[in-house]
Amino acid sequence: HVLVLVVSNDLGAALIFFVVYLLMLFTATKKVSYLFAGLGAGSVAAVLAYHIFSHVKNRVTIWLDPWSTIDTTGYQICQSLFAIGMGSWFGYGLGQGMPDKIPVAEKDFMFSALTEEFGIIFSVALLLICLNNLILMMNIASRCKTLFYRLVAVGLGVTYGFQVFLTVGGAIKMIPMTGVTLPFVS
């Protein structure tokens, strides 16, 4: 599954599937060596992706210094950061911001658009709700008696939590952009 996504250039989804597979394997076997082997393989895959895929190299370059290319390739992340900053504590209000300034705001940069219109307090509350959902999913997984159901719950929880991390992390320039949407929001 991961290779099909890599071949189709959907590396954000491939990364999510890889992390889910890795954590489900660890949950099923409890072998830390598998976890470290997966982290090593993932690190090698990240370096290879950087050298093979030009859009990955471009996203890393933008992530490192978006301000030098603010008029071209760095425009999206710079507008995202401007929107978050302009939203301040309480935001402009519903429909009062300018999320259309951020290209594809309705998908990968929904967090920035929401922060601009509703403020940082709302965004922190949204992140706490996401964290609460993740904790609930992991709590359900820990209570499952059957391995199959535990793996399903862990898989869903990790998919949700990692997708939130990738989306918000990309919007605030903590990690390079991945093109992944914010679950249940975007």
PLM feature spans:
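Transmembrane alpha-helix interface/packing and boundary motifs in multi-pass membrane proteins
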Residues: H1-N9, M86-G91, L166, M174-L182
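Transmembrane alpha-helices of multi-pass, membrane-embedded glycan-processing enzymes
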Residues: L126-N133
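Hydrophobic alpha-helical segments of polytopic membrane proteins
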Residues: H1-H51
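Membrane-interface segments at transmembrane-helix junctions in multi-pass inner-membrane proteins
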Residues: V6-S8, G12-A13, S68-D71, L182-S186
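Alpha-helical transmembrane segments of multi-pass membrane proteins
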Residues: L5, A46, Y50, I129, ...
